[in-house]
Structures are given as structure tokens and as C-alpha cells.
Amino acid sequence: MHGQVATIKDIVLEERPEVVDLHCNEQLLDSSESEEEDSVREQLVEQAQQAYRVVTTCGICKCPVRLVVQCGDADLKVLHELLLGDLSIVCPGCA
């Protein structure tokens, strides 16, 4: 543009529009692959859980009570807090 007002002859279109591929190149997972991913996640959860031996005393007769729990670290801490609080385990003889 050479002036204060644009005219049609001043507008020059040099670029041509290009064809753009609008197809997505993603591939969907088939059901077997998603099942494999689910089983891997389940295995990771199972690995996070471990078996822990817990030794406490009976809430009634005070004899030792042993049990095994399978849980994660966070759940074990919750069980620990419960056993330190009002929760009591009762032996089979007192049950």
C-alpha cells in the first residue's frame, strides 16, 4: 500500500492456500492391549501391598494375639493408629 487509502490494485495475494491433511494419525488400542495395561496396573497394586505380621494382646485376657494382614504402607499406619487407640483384637478363646 502506497498511500492513505487502500485500493484493490494495492492488495497483492502471493500465497496460495495449501491442502492440509485433517486426518488424525492416532491408532486406537484394541481391547487386548487395554486389558494388558489393566493387568499391569493390577500387578503394580498387588506389589504395593505386602503381608505384615502383627503381634498384639487380647483386649480381654491380655494374652498375645498374632495375625497377618495384607495391605499397603498407608493402610498399615492406619491400623497402627487404630490399635494404639480404642480398637482391640480379641483372641479366639475370649471370642
Swiss-Prot record:
Post-translational modification: Highly phosphorylated.
Primary localization class, coarse: host cell
Subcellular location: Host cytoplasm; Host nucleus
Keyword entries, A-Z: Activator, DNA-binding, Early protein, G1/S host cell cycle checkpoint dysregulation by virus, Host cytoplasm, Host nucleus, Host-virus interaction, Inhibition of host innate immune response by virus, Inhibition of host interferon signaling pathway by virus, Interferon antiviral system evasion, Metal-binding, Modulation of host cell cycle by virus, Oncogene, Transcription, Transcription regulation, Viral immunoevasion, Zinc, Zinc-finger
Motif (Nuclear export signal): 76-84
MF annotations from Gene Ontology: DNA binding; DNA-binding transcription factor activity; protein domain specific binding; zinc ion binding
Top-level division of the source organism's lineage: Viruses
BP terms from Gene Ontology: DNA-templated transcription; symbiont-mediated perturbation of host cell cycle G1/S transition checkpoint; symbiont-mediated suppression of host innate immune response; symbiont-mediated suppression of host type I interferon-mediated signaling pathway
Matching Gene3D superfamilies: 3.30.160.330
Family: Belongs to the papillomaviridae E7 protein family.
Domain notes: The E7 terminal domain is an intrinsically disordered domain, whose flexibility and conformational transitions confer target adaptability to the oncoprotein. It allows adaptation to a variety of protein targets and exposes the PEST degradation sequence that regulates its turnover in the cell.
Motif (LXCXE motif) on chain: 22-26
Positions of unnamed zinc fingers: 58-94
Assembly and interaction partners: Homodimer. Homooligomer. Interacts with host RB1; this interaction induces dissociation of RB1-E2F1 complex thereby disrupting RB1 activity. Interacts with host EP300; this interaction represses EP300 transcriptional activity. Interacts with protein E2; this interaction inhibits E7 oncogenic activity. Interacts with host TMEM173/STING; this interaction impairs the ability of TMEM173/STING to sense cytosolic DNA and promote the production of type I interferon (IFN-alpha and IFN-beta).
Family matches, as HAMAP family: PPV_E7
Main function: Plays a role in viral genome replication by driving entry of quiescent cells into the cell cycle. Stimulation of progression from G1 to S phase allows the virus to efficiently use the cellular DNA replicating machinery to achieve viral genome replication. E7 protein has both transforming and trans-activating activities. Induces the disassembly of the E2F1 transcription factor from RB1, with subsequent transcriptional activation of E2F1-regulated S-phase genes. Interferes with host histone deacetylation mediated by HDAC1 and HDAC2, leading to transcription activation.
A GO cellular component annotation in the UniProt record: host cell nucleus
Native source species: Human papillomavirus type 61
E7 terminal domain: region residues: 1-42
Pfam short name (any one): E7
The protein, known as: Protein E7
